[in-house]
């Protein structure tokens, strides 16, 4: 199973780990961090927006986000980068 990551565990950032999952399994999303209880729905929407706009059509993914106060735009960029790395883009 291929895995890629983007981000860090520094303050105001997040670590996103994306792995391929079994075909037909869909997206499994795990969010962790102090702000998740308050911003879960917003964070989920951002991740799903990136997945839906994925030009390669990757749909069977396991995504883990460890949040440390990242802004929405940072989370979006980290998810995009991790998916690009999973596809083999630099």
Language model region names:
Residues 1-90:
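N-terminal intrinsically disordered, cationic/polar leader segments
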């Amino acid at each position: 199973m291929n895995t890629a990551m983007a981000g860090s565990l520094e303050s105001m950032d997040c670590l996103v780990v994306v792995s391929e999952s079994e075909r037909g399994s869909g997206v499994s999303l795990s969010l962790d961090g102090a702000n998740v209880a308050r911003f879960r729905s917003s964070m989920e929407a951002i991740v799903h927006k990136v997945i839906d706009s994925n030009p390669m059509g990757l749909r069977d993914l396991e995504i883990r986000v460890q949040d440390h106060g990242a802004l929405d735009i940072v989370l979006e960029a980290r998810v995009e980068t991790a998916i690009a790395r999973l596809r083999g883009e630099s």
